[in-house]
């Protein structure tokens, strides 16, 4: 998703000052090579392992995190951003409202953000298509009996993180064990998993 996100920033007059990645095939390249778009930007992709050491020198106002879907997978990057006073927004689905799925980690990150006078938030497809759009339609209805939805998109456009949490490539048995079964728990078990930070939100 960073390919598109970087383009959006540039198209809207934003300035990209740093880029980080885990993919060794991208590290050391100018972001223009990653985007396959536009002129050279003189922003070289750095190893994510160097982020804690180099982010401060970038003087970034905000970080856009387009890597993973689950809050626990984003903890390190959010923490680095917070400790450097950098605001952060992610397209990671759980971060849209993680207080009910991973309250302990959400509280921890909230305190880091407040201590360094910055903001962490989640927004993206789920914000518009699963939230705001539905609420707007409901507001025009005289009465509502039930709401059903279906969502489809090309996983190839969203990277490995999204493909993984959707179970792409798994056989039926593996899909049932790793993806489907996590929602087949009672409320007490779900609460236990949430408190332990091990709950996989159903929107995955």
Q: PLM features: what roles do these ranges have?
A:
Residues 1-84:
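N-terminal glycine-/serine-/threonine-rich beta1-alpha1-beta2 phosphate-ribose binding loop
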Residues 1-4, 137-204:
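Active-site-lining helix/loop region of Rossmann-like oxidoreductase modules
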Residues 15, 87, 119:
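Residue-level detector of anion-binding/catalytic polar loops
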Residues 22, 68, 92-96, 125-126, ...:
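Short, ordered loop/turn segments at secondary-structure junctions
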Residues 33-38, 107-109, 138-140, 165-167:
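Short, hinge-like loop/turn segments at secondary-structure boundaries
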Residues 73-75, 79, 84, 92-118:
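Rossmann-fold NAD(P)-binding glycine/threonine-rich loop
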Residues 90-91, 120-123, 148-149:
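General beta-strand structural signal in soluble alpha/beta enzymes
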Residues 114-143:
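Short alpha-helices
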């Amino acid at each position: 998703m960073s390919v598109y996100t970087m383009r959006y920033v540039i198209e809207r007059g934003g300035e990209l000052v740093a880029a980080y990645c885990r993919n060794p095939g991208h590290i050391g390249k100018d972001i223009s090579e990653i985007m396959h778009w536009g002129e050279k930007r003189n922003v070289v992709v750095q190893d994510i392992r160097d982020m804690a050491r180099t982010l401060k020198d970038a003087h970034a106002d905000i970080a856009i995190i387009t890597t993973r879907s689950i809050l626990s997978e984003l903890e390190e990057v959010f923490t680095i951003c917070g400790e450097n006073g950098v605001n952060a927004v992610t397209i990671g689905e759980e971060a849209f409202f993680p207080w009910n799925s991973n309250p302990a980690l959400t509280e921890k990150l909230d305190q880091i953000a407040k201590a360094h006078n910055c903001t962490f938030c989640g927004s993206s497809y789920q914000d518009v298509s699963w939230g705001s759009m539905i609420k707007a339609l409901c507001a025009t209805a005289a009465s509502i009996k039930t709401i059903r939805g279906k969502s489809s998109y090309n996983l190839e456009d969203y990277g490995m993180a999204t493909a993984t949490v959707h179970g792409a490539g798994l056989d039926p048995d593996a899909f049932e064990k790793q993806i489907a079964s996590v929602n087949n728990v009672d409320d007490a078990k779900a609460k236990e998993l949430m408190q332990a930070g091990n709950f996989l939100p159903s929107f995955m």
